[in-house]
Amino acid sequence: MKKAFVLAAAVLLGMGSMMAQNTFKGIVKYKIESTGTVSMNIPDEVANAEIKVDGDNLYTKSPIFLGGMGAECVLVNGLRTTSCMNLSQLLSYLRTNGSEFTYEGTGKIIVKNEADPKDFDSLDIKDTEPGHFYYEYVDGETKEIAGQTAYKMVRHSYDEEGVDHPMTMWYSKEIGPKINVLFSGIKGMPLQCTMDAGEGRALTYTAVEIVKGKVKEADFLLPDGYETLSDDALKELFEQLQEEIELLQGE
C-alpha cells in the first residue's frame, strides 16, 4: 500500500511539473526601432524580427537576438542552446592576410551549450557589486502588448565604478521557457525592451503580433552544411581567432 501511495504521489508531482510548463505554440513577431536622442539607421533585415516558440523550444534567425560573431541562427531546447555560426568570410580574410589555423574546415560550425539551472538561482537577488547585475521583478505593474499581459522587470547592471545602468523589460509569463536562456535567464518571453547603444543611441524591440499555432516540427531543425567540433577543437579555433584579430588590430 505504501508503494502504491508513493507511486501515486510521484505521478501527481510529475503532472504538476508538466502543468507548470508553458505550452504556447506559435510565433512572436517584433518591430525594432531607433528610440534614442541620436537616430540610428536600422536595415530591413534587422527592423523586423521573430522568434518561433513551441513550449520550451525557441528558434530564431533574427540578428537582434543572435549573440556572437557569425551567428546565423539559434535553437533553444529548455536549457540547451545550439548556435549555427558562419565564420567562413572571417577565416578567408584572415588567411588572405597570412594567418594560419589548425582548423581546416569551411568555417560553418555548430556551437552547443547547456546551462545549469543553479546558475540562475541568484539572478533575482539584489547584487550591487561593481560588474554585477540582477533582475528586479516588479509586482503589480502590467500593460498589454500584442494582446498579451506584459509584466515589468528591471535589469540592474553596475559598472566598474558601481553606477547602476537599469534597463526595463516587459515580458510574458505564458510564452516560452520558465528560464529563458536566449535572454540571460529571465522568467518568460520579452515583449518589449529598450537597449542603450551608447552616445545617445538606443534600440527598442516591441512585440507587434503573436501568431498562435503557426509552427511545425520542421521549423526547429538546424540547417544543413554545419559541422560539430570537439570542445578542444572549438576552444582552440576561438583562441586562434582572437589572437589573430588582436594582431591585425595592433598593426
Predicted regions and their residues:
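Extended soluble regions of mature proteins
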Residues: 22-251
